[in-house]
């Protein structure tokens, strides 16, 4: 009996079981992401996520979590903070289970002026209809991945046995993430057998097939089942807004009515992104639309697990804060240990604010070039273009633009423009934003961004033929018909006699869900955006420089000229004539007085009519200062060099058993502090300039990670921590400026305009800074382990200090990563009705949480070499973060999409990135024997 009790205690309440379970869970999730990448979402769900064994794994983890707390007598030891924090995980798992087993989700397709009282399920069913009346839906676990293990299904229909024997299931094509499949099965009913070939489309729609079984007609389909609602949704009107001068969607919305089944009106409602219809427990989200723009596709969700899940999220965040402040908690014990090691105490101060994020408005397409061009539709731009100037004349204008305008750009740079978001900004900012997006760099053939913008705007016919638009995809260049080895295309290259070459392709890509888009799809959208921007410059529709007395919206040249207000029309005509003629003359004679005076007069006019919208010159100059100072790129090398120098100084003193030179260390400390202050100033200015928090895209998140890293070094008050954090900040800024991240400020897509998203991204990216610091501290510890000798006793003290700093940084990083990930679930649930969808990005974030939770709990296994274990695992564990941040995008999200079964290309440098840390771990393991003293 005693042995049975011991066995149960081991299996249900032991860290020796809990930690391997966490590792197994993380491994299963990782494998599932690669299954999804190769075989589609349905395969990953059928093989991992929706399987009984995966459900059992969740339940087992839940039981072991509870059992471990009971066995460790946490309540008796007054570990209230730890109990509260881990209880939140229990509540989250229970909420997820309620959602998993009792929730419903799917899609509803509604055409204008029609109503629907049912929706298509997200899960796949065998739908059976007998004689067009009796219906039966059987949930199926079939996937092509394990087609050789298909089992017959036995059912009863109209009191007669029905046997469905699956023979084979296979994909219709080899494209990844395409779930279209064909199920071949034999149906036996009424003593008659027939073979069916059932087609399931990529949207999970089943195509029905029918056969006669004596006197009974049996119809089968393989796909979504129709779930009936106790009410109807009627689509009154679908609205699609497009970007100015473009066929590309900007936003879309559905004007609907909620009706009773007898068509009685309950209420009208407008559904759009982040604006959800809630009714009788069901939530309706804007998902997609029909190509003819006469129908909408709504995602439908009914989630009884939402309340316990949200409560669990709240408890988790409060519990994490409690653990950090608990005087008997691990975090403050480590802090006290550092004090005993003559290290400073730790202070965490992180302010997270979510600012205003404006929307992007639509604008009427125009074309403006003095009086020489007329308003045109973009698809017909080639047909109405003026006769080509000779190549020599174009080169002459480019030469004069390069040489003459260089010292006369200030008046243009300071000219205030209202962008499509409604924000007033200097033309200098517009030029940098647009030109970098188009060219993927800030200069072109000796011209800076402002010169390029002026050239495109004043001489559009010249620039239609210049190959300047960047594209990274050879397949797209092949479709356009340009040389494959030339990364740049001209505006005229994307048009032919039939119009815009990418029009149909753009429409097709927009119909796909984001996670189903491959490399070509994403590049199509990027190039389409660049084409839109070039057209916007050609037409001068971006040049909203004329304030309106009646509204806060400023007018573009054509809007002002065509304004019913005769005064505005007259003033605009005169200003434009003087600006265009003055610029043209200036390029010929190098005399700029006329155009500069006109721009000054225009600024005075703006100030008089825009009133409080007009920016003070100090604010305009601050924005221009930010544009040209280029804080972040210039900080890269100083961060790296200063971090390396400080590291060399500290390590050399440790090896020699001497005190580091005070003046050298202070100088390096002050230099890094100045870099951090400049970095902070740059972030504040970028926040001020952009109008939203500086972590809204990949580039800004890298800036924020770099900032969080160097701040972590300062608050930890350790020279080694500061050297590591400075080096890490430099590496993060280096990665941000490699060229594949867009540094310019752009409008946010509708789904990103969320308060919850700002919090989610800021917290989760800051966690990467702390976990990145753990990686560097782990490397330092391993190097010091390798350097250990009997006569270098001071190295042991340093290793213990680094180990304490490392663990504190990891605790902070894990808490922030966990809170940030689950806050992302709140954002997703409020945006499209699902707080967890096993998307590869969120799944790998969960894997990273599991990895670091496992690392921090390894000490409960009783190892005597905790500093070595922590150092090794903090280095190796960081690969999960790298996979989350970079690997998912490269291998799992379609940036490089390959046919199923194709090998994934692995860059050569990646082998070294993995081999070197492993080599350090192996070398350090020979001198691993070092224990952390008992903490009090």
Give, region by region, the residue ranges found by the protein language model:
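Soluble non-transmembrane domains of integral membrane proteins
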Residues: 107-304, 359-627
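Hydrophobic alpha-helical segments
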Residues: 1-49
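Membrane-interface segments at loop-to-transmembrane junctions
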Residues: 11-12, 45-49, 77-85, 337-345, ...
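Membrane-interfacial, low-structure loops and terminal tails that flank and connect transmembrane helices
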Residues: 1-9, 334-347, 658-663, 788-805, ...
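Internal alpha-helical transmembrane segments
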Residues: 20, 49-125, 297-346, 358-361
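Hydrophobic cores of alpha-helical transmembrane segments in multi-pass integral membrane proteins
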Residues: 15-34, 52-67, 84-98, 285, ...
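Bacterial N-terminal signal peptides
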Residues: 347-355
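Internal mixed beta-strand/loop scaffold within catalytic domains of large alpha/beta enzymes
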Residues: 133-136, 141-148, 155-169, 186-188, ...
